């Protein structure tokens, strides 16, 4: 070190300084406490680093009792001053600097009020200074903030002050391994984990204490919904010999089998065969054409569903040991579910209620018989003029498919590109292919009103400030899907719903009720069949093995594919998401026109 500074970093030097400070403290008791107290307040009020170190010093200098008293009041006063500065002087700066964190804290305060602040003080999920600044922008009263902060920080203060008292007792380097100091460090490390566990247990007991727990349960787990998520959850639970109830009010197999993956891919396959006929000369054939009956095409779609139905049937799952109930579930409390007038008791509940097509409240939509991914499969006549409202995966797949069958298709998308979650060049490629297939892709068009004029139906859209009329015979509404959360007791029970409309879950797919879990479309954030199955494993295992073991749901590598032609597929994030999340990446491009397989196809 320059200027021989290393001589001040030895244990002997530090002990000598400690003795001098201790001697000064004994001779100037009030002055030392006052200066330290004021310094601590300034550090915390100014949101400067060093509060933790000063807490350790307080333990070393003042001992456990007085160190705790001094730090408790100084830290709370400083935190309150920072809170007031944020509220009245730095509101805009804090909002812009910590907006994302502030949203989480505001959400917690909105749900749990002062108890949320108490848990943050007890288990600091955010830095001490950030809580002070962020809380200044919430509506919490100053006196409540002070009291809750002082009580919430007291346990942590005692732990840190105690660690400081142990550090002060080191006389030699071998003292670092003394039981007292090692114990202090162990307490420091375990304190957040222990307090988090205590808080979670307290929250759970506070939530469940108003419900009578059954002396004996009919089932270990009851699964509501027999779609992809519910079937996999039931299968896994039955595999480990749990007693399982599976409840379905409609059809086994859910959306994937009956109105989603299976029928759409069957229809896409038929349309693709027709497109090959139109390209016969590319493959060395004389120009040819197919004659088709759309009614028979739709019959084939239903026949494919029938072939797959046994895989998801009541008989199969009954054979696996699952007790399948056909009827509508009503959750009476965290332990009881009513089905067709019968009440069953269960230790855990897994919600796999799925999602339904979202129909936006566009004026006039109630005057037309619109189609969705649920009702599309009932039509038997090919629409002459078809509007597909929405540029997501479902909208894109159906727009190209019906265009290939011969419908005059207009695809309406409010965003500047179709497949908005994909990279721009991917969207551009699909758009160009759609145009070749005859799809009129209208991006940047906002649907304003459906109008019925005699026998004609027209969608009025806004584009660049002007109204544009798009006539149609049928319209498929495919602007997204909304989680099914109403009508089976969640509102009455108080299960929390997220702002996005899905059921609120933690990283372990647990709701605010410790024995109620969610998987599939009802949980989000992905609405894929394979993701629903993926989540089902976590929801089932976490529910059956709580509180002894739990697994955080892993979404780091999620594959998905949109079955347009060409297909759009990826695994994990793309370039667009990497840029949005400020993730460094390396981009490698390989043109498919250089691929042997692509050329042969």
Language-model features and meaning:
Residues 37-66, 125-132, 153-159:
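Transmembrane helix boundary and interhelical junction motifs in multipass membrane proteins
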Residues 212-231, 239, 423-425, 436, ...:
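Mid-to-C-terminal Rossmann-like scaffold of FAD/NAD(P)H-dependent oxidoreductases
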Residues 217-219, 339-348, 465-474, 512:
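Core beta-strand elements of the Rossmann-like FAD/NAD(P) dinucleotide-binding domain
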Residues 218-246, 395-404:
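N-terminal Rossmann-like FAD-binding beta1-loop-alpha1 element of flavoenzymes
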Residues 235-242, 247-382, 415-419, 425-426, ...:
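Glycine-rich flavin
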Residues 261, 353-412, 437-441, 491-512:
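Glycine-rich dinucleotide-binding loop and its adjacent helix/turn
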Residues 366-383, 469-549:
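FAD-site-proximal beta/loop scaffold in flavoenzymes
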